[in-house]
C-alpha cells in the first residue's frame, strides 16, 4: 500500500505503518590527471560500451565514497591512487538508468601502470586536447572542470 508522507506517495506497511523510503543509487568516480593527461577507461559493457569514461562504480552499502573511488581505480585500471579531494557531485534524474547521484573525486596516482580490468577493456592516459569519444554527461562535465582549472 502507499500513503502520502512528506508530500509524496510512499510505500507503507498497512499493519504497522512503517514507511519505506527508496534510496537513490550512488555512483562514485575518480579523475586522475597527470602532466596534462587524464586517465580514462573504455567501457566493455553497456551502457555506452566502447566509449571512454572515468573509472567509476557503485557505492557499496557501508562503504566510504572515497574508498569506493580508490577501489574502482584499482579494479578498472590497476592503479593505486590517493584521493585528493571532492571535484563535484552530479544528479541524474530517475528513469535514465545508472546512478541517481554521482560523486566525483580528484586523485593522484601512487603506483602502477594502466591495465584494464573489471568492466573496462582498455585503460590509458589521454592528453586533454586529444580525447576519445566520451561516455556520459558527467564525464564530459568533469573534463570541462579540469580544463577550466588548468586555464
Describe the role of every protein-language-model region:
Residues 33-75:
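Conserved Nudix-box catalytic region and its N-terminal flanking loop in Nudix hydrolases
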Residues 59-83, 89-147:
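Unchanged
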Residues 9, 26-28, 48-50, 79-85, ...:
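A generic structural signal for short beta-strands and their flanking turns/coil linkers
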Residues 20, 34, 55, 104-106:
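A short Gly-Trp-Pro
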Residues 10, 31, 40, 104-106, ...:
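Conserved hydrophobic/aromatic beta-strand scaffold that supports enzyme active sites
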Residues 1-30:
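Acidic, metal-coordinating catalytic segment for phosphate/diphosphate chemistry
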Amino acid at each position: 500500500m502507499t500513503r502520502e508522507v512528506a508530500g509524496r506517495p510512499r510505500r507503507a506497511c498497512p499493519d504497522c505503518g512503517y514507511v519505506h523510503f527508496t534510496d537513490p543509487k550512488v555512483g562514485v568516480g575518480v579523475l586522475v590527471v597527470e602532466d596534462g593527461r587524464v586517465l580514462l577507461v573504455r567501457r566493455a559493457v553497456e551502457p555506452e560500451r566502447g566509449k571512454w569514461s572515468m573509472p567509476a562504480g557503485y557505492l557499496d552499502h557501508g562503504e566510504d565514497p572515497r574508498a569506493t573511488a580508490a577501489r574502482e581505480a584499482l579494479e578498472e585500471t590497476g592503479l593505486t591512487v590517493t584521493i585528493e579531494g571532492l571535484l563535484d557531485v552530479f544528479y541524474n534524474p530517475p528513469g535514465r538508468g545508472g546512478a541517481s547521484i554521482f560523486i566525483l573525486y580528484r586523485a593522484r596516482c601512487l603506483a602502477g601502470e594502466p591495465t584494464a580490468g573489471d568492466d573496462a577493456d582498455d585503460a590509458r592516459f589521454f592528453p586533454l586536447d586529444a580525447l576519445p569519444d566520451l561516455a556520459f554527461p558527467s564525464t564530459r562535465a568533469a573534463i570541462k572542470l579540469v580544463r577550466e582549472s588548468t586555464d
